[in-house]
Amino acid sequence: MSNSRQFIGRLSKLGRDVLPSNAALWLYGSRARGTAQADSDWDLLILLDEDQQKSTDFEKYAYPFTLMAAEDNQMIIPQIYTKKQWKQMAFTPFVKNVEHDKIVLV
């Protein structure tokens, strides 16, 4: 897909369709910073409001995004964390960078 804004809109819609209502979906990395190349991947962060992750979370919540991207010859790198895990990692450079660059999609 040539239009990044349209693709971001589709990501947001898919997030609203597949994620629980209390989940968050963020775009981060080069696509969020506006420094992406045409072949850059899409970095997505899914935050679930659960006590702990379940073995089915990736298939249920992340896989639909990778499938959508593959249909458009794009690559999505989804990361899933619980909100509790995310807070526990707040001191890490990864979390600080994501929090700085993120675009909230859901």
Q: Model regions: which residues?
A:
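Catalytic core of pol beta-like nucleotidyltransferases
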Residues: 1-26, 32-38, 49-106
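Short beta-strand->loop micro-motif that forms the acidic, two-metal-ion catalytic signature
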Residues: 42-47
